[in-house]
Amino acid sequence: RQKLATPYWVTYQYSKELQSQPIHTTTHAGQEFDLVVKGTLRVRVGEHEEVLHEGDSIFYKSSTPHGMIAVGGEECTLYAVVMRPQKEKKPEKDTFEALIKAKQDRADHETVASPFVHTELDENGILKSIDFMNEEKFNFAFDIVDKMAEKEPDKLAMLWVSKHHEEKRFTFNDMKRMSNKTANYFKSLGIKRGDRVMLILKRHYQFWFAILALHKLGAVVIPATNLLMEHDLDYRFKAAGVRALVCTPDGQVADEALRAAKNCGTVEFLMMANGAREGWLDFDAEVEKQSDVFERTEDTACGSDPMLMFFTSGTTGYPKIAEHNYKYALGHYITAKYWHNVNPEGLHFTISDTGWGKALWGKLYGQWMCEAPIFTYDFDKFDAHDILPMFKQYNITTFCAPPTMYRFFIKEDLSKYDLSSIEYSTTAGEALNPEVYEQWKRATGLSIYEGFGQTETTLSIYNPVGSVPKSGSMGIPSPLYDVDLILPDGTPAPVGETGEIVIRTDKHTPCGLFMGYYRDEEKTREAWSGGVYHTGDTAWRDEDGYFFYVGRTDDVIKSSGYRIGPFEIESVIMELPYVLECAVTSAPDPIRGQVVKASIVLTKGTQGTEALKKEIQTYVKTNTAPYKYPRIVEFRDELPKTISGKIRRVELKG
């Protein structure tokens, strides 16, 4: 891994169709030297294009967008040498001293969360312990949002930007007033404590009005994505007993929901925000008519009462329903303060859509408990060119996105964008490839602080503020959870050995851990029994206690007595400049039991040849233990995925 350069033989097939199209470009770390051995090549580097013939060569910085196609009516073969960047010392924004000072400056600040949360830091400024008080009386909407409206009514709660770049600024007083009006509207319909209400609102600002209103009413919130189709919604309506739906008019989801609701006997109220349509109640118009006073009562839902349901995005079978109580919000205090490192005077941007649990990690609970405003961009489709200028435009200070988004960012020429406002960057949702971490750090001076959690939990493993993250590691256990690694026989996994990540609950059930799977005692017992919650994810830990992700328990490959995790192999393959996406699974083998199989999506214009397969296999052999190399390599146009974007490995096995 210390070698300075990697050589490749690359063949571009001639395509008549590509001759009239703009050359597709990509980026990667380091520098590149290309020598044409046979044929003719048109090369684009940045805004510059030229044609190379046999014997011609070109040398360029490969972080500049570049691409090439064969011209002249025949295939072109070239010898490419990719030179890895040297580890250069440069000023870093997230120096240990700076992070500790920032944390200490905020440590003694009395917040609206103080009556409920007590924390202790160690001598290095890293979170040592967290305890909760009065949690059985806790209701986030009343105890945090309404208290902030009393304390600082004009403080910014959310800066919202529409897909047309129209801006709206909402203060905490706005959030209190509009959530009260919305609660009164729901109440007028007869929606009450315990009723299940689904929200399909993308990143519309009405989502925040609705979820806070439902928390005040005691109704159970079910966030859902606008990507659902009729059969998805039909299952969800029936499985959860959904009584009401607030929906976006965007796309086709409203039509899908209307058809599904007609087949389901439980859905009584269909409300549409941001528009009016036949068959739907006009959410915006009706809310505006209501009183902005809604008082807390002695029997207001709180503590252990059900508050929230998420449909898990499992890769096999129908999704389960993870149910959370009102203490779930408290579990996200660590998420915001000790992982996102939010600044009450800054602006936090978590990119997730409200249909996913990750949105509540970064767009609501923890951030507002820390009195930090959030930034929301209500876009339709992710576009790095669209989002990157916003960091400077809106002075965004902390940022969280899944690794996929960072991968899109680093393929751009980041030198064109002013990212200097960003003080801290984090990621979760999938394992972070080391190559992405290194390229982002070189471009911005910022480490990416990885974290791990599930729909059933809050942040359970993380790289905390004040620590020095290890590239490729998802971090250390959060003090909120008693996290362990166990072998199949239930004994603790030794250092360096793969085990399943579990959370021990024999001493106490932490705020943030789910109540169980709704209406499914069997699945709940399978995952959580004997004082142990099984995550189904595997990892290994080093001598410093840092965890390194391996894969799902059913994704581990058992070949010739070896246990092989897919993520390490995927990370190596992702280092190759022509690989856009990959997934590693198992395939049956009569001699070895299983062998490693790599399913790969190539960058546009790259041909999946037998020679390229051998090159990939050789690269993996060279850069990791040889027994891990993929004996089967297949090229695909795309990888099968769940609605939430997780790769369906079960479809790739075999």
Which residues make up each language-model segment?
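ATP-dependent adenylate-forming carboxylate-activation enzymes
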Residues: 201-202, 219-237, 249-256, 352-354, ...
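Structural core segment of the AMP-binding/adenylate-forming
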Residues: 104-105, 188, 212, 216-285, ...
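Conserved pre-ATP/AMP-binding loop-to-beta segment of ANL
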Residues: 153-156, 271-272, 278, 288-311, ...
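Conserved AMP-binding/adenylate-forming core of the ANL superfamily
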Residues: 154, 158-212, 229-234, 284-288, ...
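Gly/Ser/Thr-rich phosphate-binding loop
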Residues: 285, 369, 396-401, 410-470, ...
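Conserved AMP-binding/adenylation subdomain of ANL enzymes
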Residues: 330-350, 354-397, 412
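AMP-binding/adenylate-forming catalytic core of the ANL superfamily
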Residues: 228-238, 245-250, 399, 505-510, ...
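Conserved AMP-binding A3 loop
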Residues: 168-173, 299, 307-331
